């Protein structure tokens, strides 16, 4: 029986490995070849069918000056230009400026649709036969951001508008919407948990291997009052943290997100005046400047769509000259304030650093009336508790602080319990059903001398495996995702 089982197991693993190879890179390569072949075939047919358009394009390309604008060339050589470049990327404004007023594309796709107003979207929608709208209605809406200085405290005001995403939610039945189920950006679940819970996303997040150093909460102890949403001691701490990151982690991209525009400006002024000329900082900035993730200092209104390895989130708000907390948190106080926090709290891929003169204990619940300030306190509490938790409690300590979060883990079967006891008798720590959002790993194992530093993940061929809807999910994608997050996989 033993040899028979081993032979069957070996044959099954060989079959799985063959499937993974054919369903993975081989399948992608085959699809790419088919697309290239179809593209080249279509292009040759179009060039043969429209020789006058080819002549027009060549004539314009050879001109040294007085070239026709794109709209005019497109009107004269539409079929050929779309054949050469079947996929165009542009903003709705550019679409209205250069595209003919007719349906020239088969599909129009909007990305980050929550930030596109309906009037701006209509001009692009009219250029296509079908429409796909992708976006997150719980992130920033289109915003007209302006500032007032009515008194010594800085108050940012925003006027939010409805987006094309809001309109589509009304026009299209729920069954016409496709909801994403997984979050892939953050390599540690704690970097997305606050958004996942507070905004009711119910996304499955993948447990990361390094469960210790993804979160920092740096409290700035100061008696200096905050003015107009910025504290000078916090500004200094932010600049020091930027410098430290650029020196010790040059391989990681970085963005600084300030809660208010005035606070952002103060950080920029100090950093570029006192720090920029340091050699390691110049080297870091040059290294990242021409990439898709350059170093930037931004505010809540301008960071949507960005992602970086490390995010420094600087609060700025604090106490006045009398030592009292000022509950004026700019756009966070207003409608959609929680959506602004959601954007800021979900930009990090590897590390989130919170810098603040306030802790969650400083904020009185009775003073927090709207959703934005309430989530602000939850954010401070989550990251502070998680950062201060013992190593063997990281990943769960912060989660337990969040309201209305009931984490139900699947029960263990007798075989799993027996294996857990066996591993523990060998002197290791075993954490069953490891994870924070439903994408559980059956067991993770650590040494008693180094709790929280996971060495190994153990997965069983059990109920979850057999309940997977497709072989791709079961045998390829789950392993691929876990390996991407640092886990070594053994079958």
Question: Which residues are covered by each model-predicted region?
Answer:
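Conserved helicase NTPase catalytic core signature
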Residues: 1-104
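ASCE P-loop NTPase helicase motor core
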Residues: 66-199
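Conserved nucleotide-binding/hydrolysis micro-motifs of P-loop NTPases
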Residues: 94-95, 137-141, 147-148, 184-188, ...
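Short glycine-/polar-rich loops that comprise or flank the Walker A/P-loop
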Residues: 104-105, 127-130, 172-177, 212-215, ...
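Helicase C-terminal subdomain and adjacent C-terminal extension
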Residues: 147-178, 196, 271, 322-434
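Conserved helicase motor core of P-loop NTPases
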Residues: 151-252, 271
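Core RecA-like ATPase module of SF1/SF2 helicases and allied nucleic-acid translocases
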Residues: 212-353, 427
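Short beta-strand-loop-alpha-helix junction that forms the active-site gateway
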Residues: 440-479, 484
């Amino acid at each position: 029986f033993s040899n028979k089982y081993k032979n069957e197991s070996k044959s099954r693993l060989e079959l799985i490995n063959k499937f993974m190879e054919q369903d993975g890179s081989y399948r992608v390569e085959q699809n790419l070849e088919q697309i290239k072949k179809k593209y080249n075939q279509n292009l040759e047919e179009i060039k043969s069918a429209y020789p006058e358009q080819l002549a027009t394009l060549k004539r314009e390309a050879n001109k040294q000056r007085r070239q026709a604008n794109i709209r005019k060339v497109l009107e004269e050589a539409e079929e050929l230009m779309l054949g050469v470049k079947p996929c165009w990327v542009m903003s709705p404004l550019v679409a209205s400026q250069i595209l003919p007023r007719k349906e020239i594309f088969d599909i129009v796709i909007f990305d980050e649709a929550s930030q596109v107003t309906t009037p701006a979207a209509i001009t692009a929608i009219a250029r296509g036969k079908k429409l796909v709208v992708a976006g997150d209605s719980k992130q920033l809406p289109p915003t007209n951001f302006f500032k007032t200085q009515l008194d010594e405290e800085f108050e940012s005001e925003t006027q939010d508008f409805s987006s094309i995403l809001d309109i589509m939610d009304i026009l299209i039945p729920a069954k016409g919407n496709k909801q994403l189920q997984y979050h892939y950006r953050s390599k540690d679940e704690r970097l997305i948990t606050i958004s996942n819970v507070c905004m009711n996303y119910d996304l499955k997040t993948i447990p990361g291997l390094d469960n210790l150093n993804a979160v920092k909460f740096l409290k700035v102890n100061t008696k200096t009052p905050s003015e107009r949403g910025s504290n000078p001691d916090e500004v200094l701490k932010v600049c020091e943290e930027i410098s430290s990151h650029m020196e010790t982690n040059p391989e990681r991209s970085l963005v600084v997100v300030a809660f208010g525009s005035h606070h952002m400006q103060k950080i920029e002024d100090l950093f570029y005046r006192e720090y920029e000329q340091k050699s390691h900082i110049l080297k870091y900035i040059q290294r990242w400047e021409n990439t898709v993730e350059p170093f930037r200092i931004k505010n809540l209104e301008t960071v949507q769509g960005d992602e970086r390895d490390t995010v420094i989130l600087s609060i700025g708000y604090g106490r006045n000259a009398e030592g009292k907390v000022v509950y004026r948190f700019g756009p966070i106080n207003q409608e959609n304030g929680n959506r602004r926090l959601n954007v800021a709290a979900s930009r990090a891929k590897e590390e989130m650093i919170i810098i603040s003169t306030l802790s969650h204990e400083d904020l009185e619940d009775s003073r927090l009336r709207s959703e934005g300030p309430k989530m602000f306190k939850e954010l401070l509490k989550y990251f502070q508790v998680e950062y201060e938790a013992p190593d063997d409690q990281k990943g769960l300590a912060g989660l337990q602080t969040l309201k209305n979060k009931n984490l139900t883990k699947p029960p263990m079967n007798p075989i799993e319990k027996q294996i857990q006891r066996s591993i523990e008798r060998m002197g290791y720590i075993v954490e069953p059903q490891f994870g924070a959002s439903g994408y559980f790993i059956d067991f993770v194992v650590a040494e008693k001398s180094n709790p929280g530093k996971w060495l190994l993940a153990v997965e069983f061929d059990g109920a979850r495996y057999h309940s997977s809807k497709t072989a791709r999910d079961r045998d390829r994608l789950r392993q691929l995702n876990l390996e991407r997050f640092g886990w070594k996989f053994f079958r």
